[in-house]
């Protein structure tokens, strides 16, 4: 995924696009980066645990430069992180997307460590295709484990940002190999709001799916689908208003006016958390909801991380941030997310980080 609409000009042969959030820098007093490893905001302790990727960390897998990192718990108990456009050893070399890494880390507070990759010693592209005119790149939006299979939802670009369709790929071996399910979500459907997805399984045995436009230019809509129909788009039931009342089966109605970028919808017991990158406001927000159908306007937002400039970073203010993927093993009281950062001026930072949030269970979510 590309923060602020930047394209990879050298790779795609297109002109660089302007940033979304240059004028949206977060306000407030910034602490020096070295002043503290954590900060408390409204009773929530925010900590940067570590860099998860980078040449000296994941270069041994051929993943020197990666972003995103949506993640699921595999059937065998490991976590599988799925990354977007990936390069190595040098920037722009050996372009692959999506790629993956496994982690057996159980104590997230100690920091996630990776111990393997689909492909053996060198990370392979999970979906077989050539980066070219027909398909420039395929970007992952989320993964989910249902029974003994993993389902990967990904966005197919014909020129970055020109989404021709999104699809679902399936793995029956913990992410080592993947098969195209044949599911196709048209890029223009629902005013492009069926492109980028996040999902989780409810206690009622429905998978709830938030979707929005890939280029962070739309609000989100909601569908639900039975797990056994997850690869059949025609079985997805939209949530919308009919005669002024919300119901399943109506044309999908946007849930709020917020612009939803990369996001993560996850259930914790009887509650749901939704984390997302808000491009226009240049920050990562979250909400705790009673159910995915809850009107987001009835719940308060918590800003997890603010955007800022490169010379004003501190614990919870990051330059050119994006992503926001909940890491399995988290709890509402101790939430960990994967966050991306890309310095588009020189590519010196293009990596994924782990952030920890303690106390979201005690936060007052009432609007």
Question: Model-predicted segments: where are they?
Answer:
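N-terminal secretory signal peptides
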Residues: 1-10, 15-34
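Generic low-polarity alpha-helical segments
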Residues: 8-12, 105, 222, 265, ...
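Short, surface-exposed linear segments at secondary-structure transitions and domain or protein termini
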Residues: 11, 190-192
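Generic detector of bulky aromatic hydrophobic side chains
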Residues: 25, 29, 63, 81, ...
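Beta-rich carbohydrate-recognition and catalytic domains
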Residues: 36-64, 73-134, 145-190, 203-260, ...
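Beta-propeller and closely related beta-sheet repeat lectin domains
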Residues: 67-70, 135-142, 194-199, 261-264, ...
């Amino acid at each position: 995924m590309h923060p602020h609409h930047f394209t990879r000009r050298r790779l795609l042969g297109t002109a660089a696009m302007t940033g979304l959030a240059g004028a949206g820098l977060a306000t407030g007093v910034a602490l020096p980066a070295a002043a503290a490893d954590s900060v408390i905001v409204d009773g929530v302790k925010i900590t940067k645990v570590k860099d998860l990727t980078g040449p000296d960390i994941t270069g041994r897998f051929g993943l020197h430069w990666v972003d995103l990192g949506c993640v699921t718990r595999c059937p065998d108990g490991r976590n599988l992180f799925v990354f977007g456009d990936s390069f190595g050893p040098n920037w722009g070399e050996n372009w692959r997307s999506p790629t993956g890494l496994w982690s057996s880390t159980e104590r997230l507070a100690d920091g996630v460590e990776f111990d393997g990759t689909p492909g053996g010693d060198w990370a392979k592209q999970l979906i077989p295709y050539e980066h070219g005119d027909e398909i420039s790149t395929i970007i992952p939006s989320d993964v989910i484990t249902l029974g003994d299979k993993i389902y990967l939802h990904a966005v197919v670009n014909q020129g970055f940002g020109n989404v021709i369709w999104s699809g679902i790929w399936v793995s029956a071996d913990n992410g080592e190999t993947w098969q195209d399910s044949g599911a196709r979500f048209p890029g223009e459907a629902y005013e492009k709001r069926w492109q980028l997805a996040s999902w989780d399984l409810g206690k009622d045995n429905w998978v709830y799916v938030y979707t929005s436009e890939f280029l962070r230019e739309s609000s989100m809509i909601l569908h639900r689908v039975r797990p056994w129909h997850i690869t059949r788009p025609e079985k997805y039931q939209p949530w919308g208003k009919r005669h002024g009342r919300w119901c399943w089966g109506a044309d999908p109605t946007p849930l709020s006016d917020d612009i939803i970028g990369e996001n993560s919808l996850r259930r914790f017991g009887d509650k749901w958390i939704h984390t997302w990158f808000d491009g226009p406001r240049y920050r990562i927000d979250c909400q705790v909801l009673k159910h995915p159908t809850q009107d987001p306007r009835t719940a308060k937002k918590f800003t997890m991380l603010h955007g800022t400039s490169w010379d004003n970073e501190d614990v919870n203010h990051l330059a050119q941030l994006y992503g926001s993927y909940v890491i399995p093993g988290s709890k509402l009281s101790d939430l960990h997310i994967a966050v991306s950062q890309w310095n588009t001026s020189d590519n010196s930072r293009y990596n994924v980080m782990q952030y920890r949030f303690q106390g979201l269970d005690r936060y007052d979510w009432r609007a």
